[in-house]
Amino acid sequence: MFEDIKLIAFDLDGTLLDSVPDLARAVDLAMQDMGYPRVTLEQASHWIGNGADVLVSRALSQNYIVKDDLDAELIKQARARLDQHYHDGGHQLSHLYPDVKDTLERLHQQGYTLALVTNKPSQFVPELLEQHQLTHLFSEVIGGDTFAEKKPNPFALNWLLDKHGLTAPQMLMVGDSKNDIQAAQAAGCHSFALTYGYNHGEPISDSQPDVVSDEFKYLLAVLSMAR
């Protein structure tokens, strides 16, 4: 299935990096600033994945389903507070999942082109990659505000295909949420899903990715078997 893969696109939060503790802290402090109910780690783990504006909207709504009458200015204020607290926290609570760095380095050495496609605001991504010594591994880094559309829209994946002159079967999307899998399916490329991330409380297998794994390093085995 994966014998033609040339380019591998990775999600960040919940795939490479466990960032929920820092995000939960930041959104909780933002809600406290604004006099709204506090946000728990468990709530935050179900609410992230669709970008920062959606995260604060869910926190303001205290629900995964955002209130229809939520004021745009209120969302803007909450987003500004979230960004400030997230920046001030220095990402000290976040950590790479097991075998991520070694696996990425081996894929890079094997000649695969690696790209990062995340819904996280772009301003925070370079610092995180540098902090975990991953910057040199990615040919492209696409944040949630790089283009007008973010995952599950396939725009970023289609852009990568066009830039590298590849067809859809030559690209693999690696992620932990239905946003990643739906983007891959819409672009026509292959998908590799991880069970340990953040998928809004739903089994990632429900999204019907090509491969489901509990371990990031299994990606090496799958690609090796395809060669």
Swiss-Prot record:
One GO BP on record is: DNA repair
Q: Which of the seven top EC classes does this enzyme belong to?
A: hydrolase
**At which positions is Mg(2+) bound?**
11, 13, 176
Keywords linked to the UniProt accession: Carbohydrate metabolism, Hydrolase, Magnesium, Metal-binding
Pathway stated in the Swiss-Prot or TrEMBL entry: Organic acid metabolism; glycolate biosynthesis; glycolate from 2-phosphoglycolate: step 1/1
Q: Give me the reactions it catalyses.
A: 2-phosphoglycolate + H2O = glycolate + phosphate
E.C. code? 3.1.3.18
Indicate whether Metal-binding appears among the record's keywords. Answer: yes
The yes or no answer to whether the keyword Transmembrane helix is present is: no
- What InterPro entries does this protein's entry cite? HAD-like_hydrolase_sf, HAD-like_sf, HAD-SF_hydro_IA, HAD-SF_hydro_IIIA, HAD_2, HAD_sf, PGP-like_dom2, PGPase_prok
Q: Which GO terms describe its molecular function?
A: metal ion binding; phosphoglycolate phosphatase activity
Show the active-site residues: 11
Q: Which Gene3D superfamilies does the record cross-reference, listed alphabetically?
A: HAD superfamily/HAD-like, Putative phosphatase, domain 2
Cofactor(s) for this UniProt protein: Mg(2+)
Q: Listed GO cellular component terms?
A: cytosol
Q: What does this protein do?
A: Specifically catalyzes the dephosphorylation of 2-phosphoglycolate. Is involved in the dissimilation of the intracellular 2-phosphoglycolate formed during the DNA repair of 3'-phosphoglycolate ends, a major class of DNA lesions induced by oxidative stress.
Task: Tell me its family.
Answer: Belongs to the HAD-like hydrolase superfamily. CbbY/CbbZ/Gph/YieH family.
Please identify the protein, giving its name as recorded.
Phosphoglycolate phosphatase
